[in-house]
């Protein structure tokens, strides 16, 4: 997160990415990138019964998804009533439990220190995700609050935030054999995925996603000069792409050297045998095993198109157009019925993301990225392509990349979305204004909206089905492990 703010504050004449940054006094600290926040977890509450209220075993996939989402949004709205908290509902044990996490949202965050590239990115990513790592990859923010101790917008009168508790950093240094601990905020885990999912992840998804990332890295580098404004605009993106490309590659290599899939296959077979060895267990858990297996097979059928669509967001301006039009559509609904990301609680973030584009976008790079992504999209079977996308860009099974590139060129020449004031104005525009626009990228967003929503509806139906069966499968895993004394 530090790197994004360093990039945002860098220019060719004042390249903090290369030179580093140090605020020797409080007043030397500089604002971070728009939307930067510090979150302090204050409370974690089990809300499983609240989230699953009204849900029954016979509830359809889409209805289950909608009911759980509505219950989540209601809990979050109550939790955020003070105006100073950002709350979320997270599922644990694959949806077997749900917890409401209440976090203080500190909005005035300033950059204090960032190392020079020669320290912070020493050696590149060659030893990233490995131990030991010979890189000074760290930085410092300072969080500020109002004089009353409550979160506030940026002001010179604000004071440093004082947490209720903290760890002291020793100035004594370390010695051979000292205890070392890695500290991090809990994220997610895939350790309870099925053998079929694990195999797909390591043998298909990670290699494919790595290649996508490496290709986009090459496109950015080929279309921007090192140290130029264009390259600086994408340094944070490059770091993110490279970070997970290395992660995926390392996991694939480790997987190939291990007997992991054999052990996972054996463990899953033992679980199924344990379930089937008892009539009560078979009645309780066997349906979940079978249904989950069928859902996974169904989900894998569209994996290529899902992957391509997941990377389309790297084309900045078309992505912005889609988000802006989606906002206009969502604003027609009561706030509680809007899609997460488009509620009133999200509008400040959405505005800040539109502002940030001004320092994280270059037209040449964006056009080249979109050209690449559409070339990958065109490789999909016709049934997985969008009629609106095919029509707008002139894509068919026999793609003429030159023709597609000309459509891209013409669209970027005529769009005004590269202008920040225009993007911000669209935030307050009506559906009718979008539909009447002659901006080509806005027109594309309008034309493709119905198909995008149809795909989203299919995805929600599938997610609702997973929400039905994953918790029962997880319940079986827990019961089996307990039978082994684990």
Regions found by a protein language model. Name each.
Residues 1-486:
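Terminal presequence/propeptide segments associated with secretion/organelle targeting
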